Structures are given as C-alpha cells and as structure tokens.
Amino acid sequence: MTRATALLLALFAGASTQAAGVDVTVTDASNRPVDQAVVVVEPVGGAPAPRSSGLRSVIDQQNLQFVPEISVVRTGTSIEFPNSDQVRHQVYSFSPAKNFKLALYAGKLYPPLVFDKPGLVTLGCNIHDSMIGFVYVTDSPWFGKTDAQGHVEITAVPPGDYRVRLWHPRFAPDEAQIERSLKVPVTGDANLPVSLKRALRPEPGNNASNKWKGY
C-alpha cells in the first residue's frame, strides 16, 4: 500500500466516523411520542471529549414562561436570561449545579451566566411562582431533545460503547432518569427505541402550587 493510498483510507475512515449517528425514539406507556425529552450519549470507559470554549445559549422570558422551558447544554456554556415581558422577573436557582439569583429586572440587565458544573438546574422566578424551567448540563458533546414525534438524531458520534441517559420532568418518579447501553457501529446509524413503563405525569396547569410539584 502506498503512502498516498494509506492517507486516503485514513481520511475516508475519519469521515465515516464523523458521519455515525444515534437515532433515539421515546414513547410513553401508551405508545405515544414523548416530546422534549433530554437525550445524552456518554462514552463508556473512554476519555471524555475536551470541553469547548465560547458555547452560548439563551433562555428568554415570554408570557410569564421560560422559553425554552427545557434546555440541554454542555458544561461551560454561557446562558443569557433576557426578559421580553412587560413585567419584571427575578430569576433564581437553588440547584447544586448552579445556585444563583438575578435581582428584579427587565430587558437585558445581566451578562450571561456560565454553567460550569454538570447536573440538573431548576429555574424559578421569585415574583411569579408558576414560572419553572430546567437546564440539563452535561459533560458530553453528544446530546439533544426529542421532537413532537418523540425522535432525536445525534450526529458525529464515534464508534464505540456508550451509555444513553434520558430525562424529562414528567417522567414517573421510578423512571426519573433512564439509562440504556448502546454500541455505535463503525458505519451506519445506531437506533435506540425507548418505551416508558409508566405514564407521564400530568401536564402542570396554571395553579402555581401544583406546577412541577417536587421540583
């Protein structure tokens, strides 16, 4: 094999590795698609991918809601919290992964906050108790959220053995965080259907005392 041929084969192999994908579909106990479920793909026994710098995200406040309500970001991401409402908000979190409080404000008063620890961060507003949001922070570069069909495709996953974690605030308590093992092939995609054993918890209504009770 010539050096040029070896180089071409190496480049092709690298391209194939980058093209690998993980397709996850999540359904509930009634076989209905689960929207907005967090899906994270983590390598098993391998070194974690180096952290990237300059990662940014935005969680707006619109119509007394966090938009998006559920976010998933990589550790080290800077998140901005603009207030697009005509009323002021006071965003806070008591979660160990990010404990903070932004004093009463409107517009874009504060610089972005860096979410530098992995874990689940629950957001609230001291003025409007019905406002609840979630930020899932992960060390893995491979993550996403399911769409209205309960599907998410996570691309550029190298071949190997992985642990797939799933989370959603409406998962039943005994399925609060689901884990599955998955092997990603050298070529082609890896498919992972996940069917919940329990029904999703009810969608929270406008009653602030019942909004995501337990979070």
PLM segments and residue spans:
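Generic extreme N-terminus detector
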Residues: 4-5, 23
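Bacterial N-terminal signal peptides
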Residues: 5-16
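Extracytoplasmic copper-binding redox domains, predominantly the cupredoxin/blue-copper superfamily
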Residues: 19-215
